[in-house]
């Protein structure tokens, strides 16, 4: 099934604009993936559409407030949540500059004003809490 069919078969109530944003997002992943290795090269658009829907289901289970997507990669689930709930504040974190450059592009392309990105490496340090 393609994205529109998957959304129609689901319980999601997305506007035409949100469906268009989701479709553009998936197309941009495939386009950028040719040079930036965002996702597996074996993934097709219908695979990404299913992944989008899997991420969309999270929305129902989130409490109100901001969300941090650690190791976001190509933006799953952060960008998906930004499309579905454009008022929710989202911070996408990844250490790979190729991926964060894609995130900047897609945020601007889709007009996701509540989404911000961080390019950093997360690590743990010794602390009293760890002992």
Model regions: which residues?
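Short alpha-helix immediately C-terminal to the canonical SAM-binding loop
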Residues: 99-101
């Amino acid at each position: 099934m393609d994205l529109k069919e998957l959304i129609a078969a689901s319980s999601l109530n997305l506007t035409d604009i949100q469906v268009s944003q989701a479709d553009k997002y998936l197309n941009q992943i495939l386009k950028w993936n040719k040079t930036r290795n965002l996702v597996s090269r074996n993934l097709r658009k219908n695979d990404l559409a299913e992944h989008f829907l899997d991420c969309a289901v999270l929305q129902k289970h989130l409490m109100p407030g901001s969300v941090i997507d650690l190791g976001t990669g190509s933006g799953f689930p952060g960008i998906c949540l930004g499309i579905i709930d454009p008022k929710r504040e989202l911070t996408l974190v990844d250490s790979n500059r190729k991926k964060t450059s894609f995130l900047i592009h897609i945020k601007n392309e889709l007009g996701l004003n509540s989404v911000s990105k961080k390019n950093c490496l997360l690590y743990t340090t010794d602390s009293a809490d760890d002992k």
